[in-house]
Swiss-Prot record:
<dbReference type="GO" id="GO:0006412">
    <property type="term" value="P:translation"/>
</dbReference>
<dbReference type="Pfam" id="PF00164">
    <property type="entry name" value="Ribosom_S12_S23"/>
</dbReference>
<keyword id="KW-0488">Methylation</keyword>
<feature type="modified residue" description="3-methylthioaspartic acid">
    <location>
        <position position="89"/>
    </location>
</feature>
<protein>
    <recommendedName>
        <fullName>Small ribosomal subunit protein uS12</fullName>
    </recommendedName>
</protein>
<comment type="function">
    <text>Interacts with and stabilizes bases of the 16S rRNA that are involved in tRNA selection in the A site and with the mRNA backbone. Located at the interface of the 30S and 50S subunits, it traverses the body of the 30S subunit contacting proteins on the other side and probably holding the rRNA structure together. The combined cluster of proteins S8, S12 and S17 appears to hold together the shoulder and platform of the 30S subunit.</text>
</comment>
<keyword id="KW-0694">RNA-binding</keyword>
<dbReference type="InterPro" id="IPR006032">
    <property type="entry name" value="Ribosomal_uS12"/>
</dbReference>
<dbReference type="GO" id="GO:0000049">
    <property type="term" value="F:tRNA binding"/>
</dbReference>
<feature type="compositionally biased region" description="Polar residues">
    <location>
        <begin position="105"/>
        <end position="114"/>
    </location>
</feature>
<comment type="function">
    <text>With S4 and S5 plays an important role in translational accuracy.</text>
</comment>
<keyword id="KW-0689">Ribosomal protein</keyword>
<comment type="subunit">
    <text>Part of the 30S ribosomal subunit. Contacts proteins S8 and S17. May interact with IF1 in the 30S initiation complex.</text>
</comment>
<feature type="region of interest" description="Disordered">
    <location>
        <begin position="101"/>
        <end position="138"/>
    </location>
</feature>
<dbReference type="InterPro" id="IPR012340">
    <property type="entry name" value="NA-bd_OB-fold"/>
</dbReference>
<dbReference type="GO" id="GO:0015935">
    <property type="term" value="C:small ribosomal subunit"/>
</dbReference>
<dbReference type="InterPro" id="IPR005679">
    <property type="entry name" value="Ribosomal_uS12_bac"/>
</dbReference>
Amino acid sequence: MPTISQLIRKGREVLTEKSTAPALKECPQKRGVCTRVYTTTPKKPNSALRKVARVRLTNGVEVTAYIPGIGHNLQEHSVVLVRGGRVKDLPGVRYHIVRGALDTAGTQNRNQGRSKYGTKRPKKGAATAAKGPVKGKK
């Protein structure tokens, strides 16, 4: 505990908050080009093949970004939009690719949480036809 005279001489040091997505340089999103698209395995209790991409951002920084949703159309040289947000079971993956923006297509056949996966609102007639026949009616 400092004395009053020590506080007068030095003052309190203000704690600076460390950014969770430093490569974005305080921007909400950044554009980038995929340099490599591949799958990787998660940390210990989990088991899967997670889809990730190595992206070179417009500021020259190269980051690893997660591709959310089922299926994607990304390949090398695809232009993508990158936002912050880490993937807990993938070490070193601190960014997400935004679905439905630039070269990234939205996820198909999605009815809930569509805004997170860039899926357009289904047509009125198409939604019931896609579900199949209604049980109980002949």
